[in-house]
Amino acid sequence: PKAVGGSGRFADALVDALHAQGFTIAIESNGTIAAHRGIDWVCISPKAGSEVVQRRGNELKLVWPQQGSDIAAMEGWGFDNFLIQPMDSGDSGVNESNRKAAIEFVSQNPKWRLSIQNHKLLGLP
């Protein structure tokens, strides 16, 4: 796996040092670069049209709707959890439509669960 911005030895040392101090390491990525082997929780949120190389992890989170996403291929990837999150467009009408589309998607695709951003529902930045 690649380490962003440096050698794998540096990433190994950093991960080992954080673990030695009792930290749990979690990342969220678009998946275009492989996650370091020592990461404890890997969440991948792919963007349509990108080449996803990290196809294993704890959580695959797809922002919905997202045209061009190959759902069937994604379902074959090695993730523990498959999540759909309604896209936040900044427009309340569009957001309502996106929420309905996400709910409809998970109701028709039992492998996927709904994920929401609670801070946005509460009006927090």
What is the role of each PLM region?
Residues K2-P125:
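Conserved AdoMet/S-adenosylmethionine-binding subsite of the radical SAM
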